[in-house]
Amino acid sequence: MDPEVSLMLLCPPGGLSQEQVSVELSPAHDRRPLPEGDKTITAIWETRLQAQPWIFDAPKFRLHSATLASSSPEPQLLLHLGLTSYRDFLGTNWSSSASWLRQQGATDWGDKQAYLADPLGVGAALVTADDFLVFLRRSQQVAEAPGLVDVPGGHPEPQALCSGSIPQHEDLPGELVVRELFSSVLQEVCDEVNLPLHTLSQPLLLGIACNETSAGRASAEFYVQCSLTSEEVRNYYLSGGPEANESTGIIFVETQRVQRLQETEMWAQLCPSAKGAILLYNRHPPLQSGAGKSHLSHPSVPALSLQL
């Protein structure tokens, strides 16, 4: 296993649909206050703001743990989520004391992630109609992994479920959180690759990977099938999109080559989130044989409706 990434959860072969995932959102799953208080988080944030005044804080979902039950008639996954923020991420996972915080969390709570923000990300193993996986070269201007190769992705947003107010646990029903989780990965594909929503399948959750370069921050990785060919996808990408500034180029890799991608020079160019997505994708042979194409959605499916 690559030291930059670890696998927290592998879903059953073929992945899980939205209907097979549920969420328990509770303050019990939030980050623990730091042993000496959160003043260091505030100081780190203020320093970062001085250097990069364009950044802004935003609430995020925090992944505490996940429970997979192999029940009949089909497996069910329960995600235990709390709330956190981008500010707390910079002050914990991304801070110079992250390793110490993990050690202290293990000592104090029996959980090395207890003091870390751990905002949950999403990523897409996006496969074209002619069987290519889609990658993006990240811009040098982005905060994380500038210049490296990534899969389309981002974060589910608590704010999307309660616009105009600060999200509170009791205001976020589990069913809506699950919908935001699955729809957010489609939103990221639409925004970053500039693809029409109706060309994308319903996402299938492959598993959860952890970025060890940011102290184990987790990302839910999905399989998404596109009804367009790689050339058509390239043309849409080159015509620009809402987040075109986040990447500088698009890369296509044949799905049959992805199994051995770790043995190629390209692997060293992948950021940890992309490595996690590929490691999980490679553990789902049914999807590599084309079974996922049966999940192509219709644009009228309510669960996939997005505000573009």
UniProtKB/Swiss-Prot annotation:
Domain of life: Eukaryota
Cofactor(s) the protein requires to work: Mg(2+)
Enzyme class, UniProt record, top EC level: hydrolase
Nudix hydrolase domain sequence ranges: 117-284
EC number: 3.6.1.45
Positions contributing to substrate binding: 56, 86, 138, 143, 150, 155, 157, 273
Key words, A-Z: Hydrolase, Magnesium, Metal-binding
Reactions listed under catalytic activity: UDP-sugar + H2O = UMP + alpha-D-aldose 1-phosphate
Residues annotated to bind Mg(2+): 188, 192
Biological role: Hydrolyzes UDP-glucose to glucose 1-phosphate and UMP and UDP-galactose to galactose 1-phosphate and UMP. Preferred substrate is UDP-glucose.
Name of protein: Uridine diphosphate glucose pyrophosphatase NUDT22
